[in-house]
Design a protein with these regions (language model features):
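Short, acidic/small-residue loops that bind anionic groups at enzyme active sites
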Residues: 86-107, 192-212, 356-377, 462-481
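Periplasmic-binding protein-like
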Residues: 69-76, 174-182, 339-346, 444-452
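Short, glycine-/small-residue-rich phosphate/pyrophosphate-handling segment
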Residues: 13, 106-141, 216-250, 283, ...
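Short beta-strand segments enriched in small/hydrophobic residues
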Residues: 1-16, 111-115, 267-285, 381-385
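Glycine-rich, highly charged phosphate/nucleotide-binding loops
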Residues: 46-63, 156-164, 316-333, 426-434
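N-terminal beta-loop-helix "entrance" segment that forms/cooperates
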Residues: 33-55, 148-153, 306-325, 418-423
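C-terminal alpha-helical cap/extension of soluble enzyme domains
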Residues: 4-7, 25, 29-30, 35, ...
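Active-site rim beta-loop-alpha module in soluble metabolic enzymes
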Residues: 128-181, 190, 398-451
């Protein structure tokens, strides 16, 4: 896996400092190369400077794709040039702000961004609106230390980050903190610990880490941004700019690093993930465990369990309600057994909120994970669900996750869940047919299969859609859930206990 990081400034010290920080956090099989700009500003602290950085960013994007990089990160919280870069390239291109804000929205109901200067606050507000997350943004607060001074006095920076984070929690109601500059790399755990010591238990997200883990996940899943949202620009002469990667200025690349051999401090923790099947029936366990196991990276341990009381399948709100008590029991057991994360194997995300109140380890809902990923890769997504009667439930979920405006449509294949395993070919054909209609008739730019029983179908559906001229990405929600779980374990993050506080300690008759 080859990941290129573009540091969108001309300051060589920033470029040199960036490489070891990414390498230390990357997977052992990831090769990280870093490049700065040959023309542009020394730091980015205004729209004006962002605009002047973009032309050379695009040159670097062309070069990265020509050099067969698997993914690319633009290392700045302004996400400069993200949209035009995605028009220009087919490989995944990740913006730290987009990745971190969506991750914050998955883990908490309200996040605050602690940024650099007062003048950056309107930018944060704008990005939250652009990414459809305005309702999640509690505040943006500055440390009032210019970018070029961030690395000169780390103690002063940490004190300012802690001070503004405390104010964000106490005064603004933030449940999770997002650093507002990639120049704050490597300080998240230190700030989180300092907040804990002051009595404020909130997760702290490093946007560079969020971007890296998203890039790794996209490469693993073979996904990229939708070319219907980001179509290639029309061919035309653009005076004064190179049209091909070979025409660009020299790259001045730092040598690619294979972290497996070069950095003994690299994150190598093996994630232990429990998949909870929220229906009754031990016959589900082996195939589910095998299917999820294929999505995990080498070393990830995945075990599956089914519930012992509840419905045989989930196709209604009633079914979901009757499954949740047993799901919660399994969540408790998973944490007691030392699991690192839990995935709920159902696109209804049954019991996600109470499970997060109950547990401190990450609990992942496939629908939440897949919808947020779809919103990052495209402007409009469609969900292909099971039955017609389940369509309102999908719309409720999109509303719950603040993504209603991103939904192009919800379509059903009208094959009951209990019949899906009997004829996978029939199910795949039905998903392809409804997906094609979603693209051609509803304007979908990306497809989300709406049942975890459709696991593993995404590549086939995506290929068949392309053959029909409906080329869009297709997300595999279970695979995305595994990737999110692995990334959270790598980053030492979980949901916010301010959004999901532990339930009161009291007797509940009939339950453990």
């Amino acid at each position: 896996m080859k990941i290129r990081v573009i540091v969108p400034v001309t300051t060589r010290e920033f470029v040199g400092a960036t490489r070891p920080q990414y390498v230390a956090a990357a997977r052992p099989d990831a090769e990280i190369s870093v490049v700065g700009l040959d023309r542009g500003p020394v730091s980015l602290e205004s729209d004006y400077e962002d605009a002047l950085a973009v032309p050379d960013i695009l040159t670097k994007v062309r070069v990265a794709e020509a050099e067969e990089m698997d993914a690319l990160i633009i290392d700045c919280m302004a996400d400069p040039g993200l949209a035009p870069a995605r028009e220009l390239a087919s490989i995944p291109i990740v913006g730290p702000a987009q990745a971190a804000m969506h991750l914050a929205a998955i883990l908490a109901h309200r996040f605050s961004v602690v940024t650099v200067l007062e003048r950056d606050i309107p930018l944060i507000d704008h990005l939250a609106r652009l990414y459809g997350l305005e309702g999640y943004l509690a505040s943006a607060r500055p440390v009032n230390i210019p970018v070029l001074e961030l690395g000169k006095d780390q103690e002063r920076l940490v004190e300012a980050l802690v001070e503004q984070s405390v104010r964000a929690v106490v005064e603004d109601g933030a449940h999770i903190i997002v650093f507002g500059c990639t120049g704050m790399k490597g300080l998240a755990q230190q700030v989180e610990q300092a907040l804990e010591e002051q009595g404020y238990t909130v997760p702290v997200i490093d946007p560079s880490l969020a971007a890296l883990k998203l890039a790794e996940a996209l490469v693993d899943m073979g996904l990229s941004h939708s070319k219907r949202t980001y179509p290639p620009p029309p061919p035309k002469e653009i005076v004064g700019y190179p049209q091909g990667a070979s025409d660009g200025p020299s790259q001045k690349l730092l040598a690619p690093v294979s972290g497996a051999s070069s950095h003994p401090g690299k994150l190598r923790r093996r994630a232990r993930i429990r998949v909870i099947i929220p229906v009754v029936g031990e016959h589900w366990i082996a195939p589910v465990q095998e299917a999820y196991g294929r999505a995990g990276r080498p070393g990830t341990e995945i075990s599956a369990v089914a519930i012992d009381r509840g419905p045989a399948s989930i196709e209604s709100v009633r079914d979901e309600a009757l499954a949740i008590p047993a799901v919660l029991s399994q969540v408790r057991t998973a944490e007691e057994e030392g699991m690192d994360a839990v995935v709920l194997d159902c696109m209804a995300d049954p019991g996600l909120d109470p499970a997060r109140e109950l547990a401190s380890i990450p609990v992942i809902g496939p629908a939440q994970a897949a919808m947020h990923l779809a919103a990052m890769l495209a402007h409009r997504f469609s969900v292909i669900t099971v039955l017609e009667q389940g369509i309102p439930g999908v719309h409720r979920q999109a509303l719950r996750y603040g993504l209603t405006e991103k939904v192009a449509s919800v379509r059903a294949i009208n094959i009951p869940v209990l019949e899906m395993s009997e004829d996978r070919e029939r199910v795949t054909r039905a998903v392809i047919e409804e997906s094609a209609k979603a693209v051609c008739e509803d304007g979908a730019h990306i497809i989300v299969p709406g049942c975890t029983e459709m696991i593993g179908m995404a590549p086939v559906v995506q290929e068949c859609l392309a053959e029909r001229g409906c080329e869009v990405p297709v997300i595999d929600p279970p695979a995305m859930s595994v990737k999110l779980a692995e990334g959270l374990v790598d980053m030492g993050l979980a949901h916010s206990k301010r959004t999901y506080p532990p339930p009161p300690d009291k007797e509940i008759v009939g339950y453990l």
